[in-house]
């Protein structure tokens, strides 16, 4: 398929939001994520990283942030949020909370970076947003994008939570079950994706 060349663009946006790669030109690997104002703007979804510690800072608006078993509303006054490796996390707009409803009419802007700062986050986001932009219509287009997205996630340390696991057996067992479920389901999707030509990253999207 013909892919849009986006590798040199400083910003990539789709209707729900997008990424600004140029806000911190003196700090490579730092990205600003925009979640547009609106009732139907999705969040990041629960996921975890295994080779990167992630740092998150709200620049504008209010974010409802989940880290492990704790969820709270954060604003720019709350400083830097640290997400340790293997810790499930997500964030979204906080419009439906008492603390966050004041920001319901403004875009949520969250700044992200990682340790190590190896540039992998930018490669991940560039490929993810570009795949969504290039998605073909119809069921085949949706399936193709899903397989491509899973392949990119697998190769760039982003693991979605398909099931949080049983809490009754304790956190250690819960984490093992969660990883097993994600690796099994995601691994099958990635294997099939690679068989049909999906790649970890695309030269049209990657600087």
What are these model-derived regions, one by one?
Residues 26-30, 40-55, 76:
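A short beta-loop-beta micro-motif enriched in histidine and acidic residues
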Residues 55, 62-64, 68-89:
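Short acidic-glycine-tyrosine-enriched beta hairpin
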Residues 1-37:
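A short, N-terminal "cap"/entry segment at the start of jelly-roll beta-barrel domains
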């Amino acid at each position: 398929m013909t892919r849009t060349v986006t590798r040199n663009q400083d910003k990539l946006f789709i209707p729900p939001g997008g990424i600004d790669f140029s806000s911190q030109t003196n700090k490579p690997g730092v990205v600003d994520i925009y979640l547009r104002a609106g009732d139907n703007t999705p969040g990041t979804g629960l996921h975890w990283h295994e080779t990167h510690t992630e740092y998150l800072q709200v620049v504008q608006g209010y974010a409802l942030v989940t880290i492990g078993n704790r969820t709270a509303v954060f604003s720019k006054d709350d400083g830097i949020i640290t997400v340790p490796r293997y810790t499930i996390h997500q964030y979204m707009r906080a419009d439906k909370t008492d603390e966050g409803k004041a920001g319901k009419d403004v875009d949520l802007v969250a700044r992200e970076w990682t340790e190590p700062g190896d540039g992998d986050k930018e490669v991940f986001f560039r490929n993810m947003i570009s795949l969504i932009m290039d998605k073909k219509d119809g069921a085949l287009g949706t399936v193709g994008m899903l397989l491509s997205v899973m392949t990119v996630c697998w190769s760039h340390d982003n693991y979605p939570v398909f099931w949080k696991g049983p809490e009754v057996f304790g956190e250690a067992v819960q984490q093992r079950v969660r990883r097993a479920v994600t690796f099994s389901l995601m691994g099958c999707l990635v294997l099939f994706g690679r068989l049909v030509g999906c790649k970890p990253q695309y030269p049209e999207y990657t600087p």
